[in-house]
């Protein structure tokens, strides 16, 4: 198969949702259809000992939430599928946002009883900003939920995207009978031995069923007043195809997967800082690091840089340019994933995600190129932390483990590190509280370094240039610190303190982000 044909087979997407909408369960079912797992390990039993394949970190297994984005790959129906499972928890927006830079489409999982929730809305806005297609799976039809028409209306009003139902539920909860499949023009049956039936048989199958009569009325209404189906509008991110189903009972999921792969796009090009778009079908390899993860295998204390291949082909042992440093690197120890399990890979193509073993060479956002190509891809989004804690080792004899742990976890971008200019104390900054809990848990579990963490509350962060820096600017209302790149930064106790500083030093430029 030619390189172009291989690239065109790739489908790389992320799954986004609010916590508990069923995202991990649907991921499991997709892996099941891809032949990667023998049974979908129902995530329901948080005490059952059957853990989701994609939730590999200890704290995720204990709490039943995804806190890092994992990558999984399988072959299905002539396509190579790359799934990026994103954290559903709101505190992990930074990792999630970066992950969404590495995909060509998104699947949005919505709980039929709850509709569009806060985290879904946040993540959707990022996806919308990138103009990538969004496919909606309205989940938990095996339970009582809201009316389908009401859910479609909410999609359009809250998210501002047109919708087109690919199927329609016949009843829900205990009265759930199946799906009226508008796209494939058939009925998908929830009960009994037969999985499908023709629409012509519907009246006979559901004689005297008020839900079926309601479905026919709804469909007539949608055909008259609903949006037109348009493949181009889907690819442009202007229309979301909507599927109903139940991930827990694995109903409607395979039909969803088949239809998703029919319409999901091939790998996209990516913009460089100069505004050029790198064509995925170009023969020269290029890619960018969108995530770094330490200790995916605690036995080996390893670090892996996740790279989205943007163009060309990766071959084991190839040399690449690291644009940020201007130095070369060799990609010899490279892996592909199934959550915590992995295998060495000898080649991969545009659209694929590879993991490069990293001894500290790479940073999130790095661009890799070959030959004379020295461009950089557009920077990934960064977030200014809002809450802070002082951190120190509980046991001074464990200083070495403490420093190693902090260095690795900060390089992942999971948490941000600052050092007090005057006292040398370490301070951690995060977008949400859960990040601190995960940090503490991982320091103790992975680095055997117990830590003492003291809350500092919310702070307003502003960077200043070295040239403007004068230590006398530090006062009781701010803390002067350095970030991990040794850039000076002020942590103001509130917006009033920030305004007071700006009035006192009008010539000093304060930057919101590095």
Swiss-Prot record:
Q: Which cysteines are joined by disulfide bonds?
A: none
Give GO terms for biological process.
regulation of translational termination
SUPFAM superfamilies from the entry?
EF-G C-terminal domain-like (SSF54980), P-loop containing nucleoside triphosphate hydrolases (SSF52540), Translation proteins (SSF50447)
Q: Name one molecular function that GO assigns to this entry.
A: GTP binding
- Keyword annotations from UniProtKB, A to Z: Cytoplasm, GTP-binding, Nucleotide-binding, Protein biosynthesis
Residue positions binding GTP: 17-24, 85-89, 139-142
Q: Which NCBIfam families match?
A: prfC (TIGR00503), PRK00741.1 (NF001964), small_GTP (TIGR00231)
Q: What is this protein called?
A: Peptide chain release factor 3
Q: Which gene encodes it?
A: prfC
């Amino acid at each position: 198969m030619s390189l172009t044909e291989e690239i065109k087979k790739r489908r790389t997407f992320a799954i986004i949702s609010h916590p508990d909408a069923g995202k991990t369960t649907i991921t499991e079912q997709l892996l099941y259809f891809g032949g990667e797992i023998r049974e979908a390990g129902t995530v329901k039993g948080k005490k059952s000992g059957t853990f989701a394949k994609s939730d590999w970190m200890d704290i995720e297994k204990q709490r039943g939430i995804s806190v890092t984005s994992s990558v999984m790959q399988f072959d299905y129906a002539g396509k190579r599928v790359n799934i990026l499972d994103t954290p559903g928890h709101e505190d992990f927006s930074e990792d999630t946002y970066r992950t969404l830079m590495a995909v060509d489409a998104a699947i949005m999982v919505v709980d039929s009883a709850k509709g569009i929730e806060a985290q879904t809305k946040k993540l959707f806005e990022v996806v919308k900003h990138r103009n990538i297609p969004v496919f909606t799976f309205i989940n938990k039809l095996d339970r009582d939920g809201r009316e389908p028409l009401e859910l479609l209306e909410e999609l359009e009003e809250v998210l501002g995207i047109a919708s087109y139902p690919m199927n329609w539920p016949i009843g829900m909860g205990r009265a759930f009978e199946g799906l009226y499949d508008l796209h494939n023009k058939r009925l998908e049956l929830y009960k009994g031995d037969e999985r499908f039936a023709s629409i012509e048989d519907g009246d006979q199958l559901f004689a005297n069923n008020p839900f079926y009569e309601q479905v026919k009325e709804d469909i007539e209404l949608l055909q008259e007043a609903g949006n037109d189906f348009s493949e181009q509008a889907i690819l442009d991110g202007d229309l979301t195809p909507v599927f109903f189903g139940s991930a827990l009972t694995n109903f409607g999921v395979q039909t969803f997967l088949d239809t998703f792969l029919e319409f999901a796009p091939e790998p996209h090009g990516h913009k460089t800082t100069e505004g050029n778009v790198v064509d995925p079908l170009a023969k020269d390899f290029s890619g960018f690091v969108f995530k770094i993860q330490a200790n995916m295998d605690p036995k080996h204390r390893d670090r892996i840089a996740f790279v989205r291949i943007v163009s060309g082909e990766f071959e084991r042992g190839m040399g690449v340019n690291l644009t940020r440093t201007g130095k070369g690197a060799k990609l010899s120890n490279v892996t592909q994933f199934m959550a915590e399990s992995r295998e060495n890979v000898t080649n991969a193509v545009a659209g694929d995600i590879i993991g490069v073993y990293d001894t500290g060479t790479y940073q999130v956002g790095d661009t890799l190129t070959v030959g004379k190509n020295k461009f950089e891809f557009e920077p990934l989004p960064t977030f200014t932390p809002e809450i802070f804690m002082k951190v120190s080792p509980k046991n001074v004899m464990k200083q070495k483990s403490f420093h190693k742990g902090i260095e690795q976890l900060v390089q992942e971008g999971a948490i941000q590190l600052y050092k007090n200019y005057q006292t040398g104390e370490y301070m951690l900054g995060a977008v949400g509280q859960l990040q601190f809990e995960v940090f503490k848990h991982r320091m103790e579990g992975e680095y055997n370094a117990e830590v003492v963490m003291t809350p500092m509350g919310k702070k307003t962060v502003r960077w200043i240039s070295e040239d403007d820096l004068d230590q006398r600017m530090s006062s009781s209302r701010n803390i002067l610190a350095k970030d991990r790149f040794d850039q000076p930064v002020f942590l103001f106790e509130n917006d009033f303190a920030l305004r007071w500083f700006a009035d006192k030093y009008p010539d000093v430029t304060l930057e919101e982000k590095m």
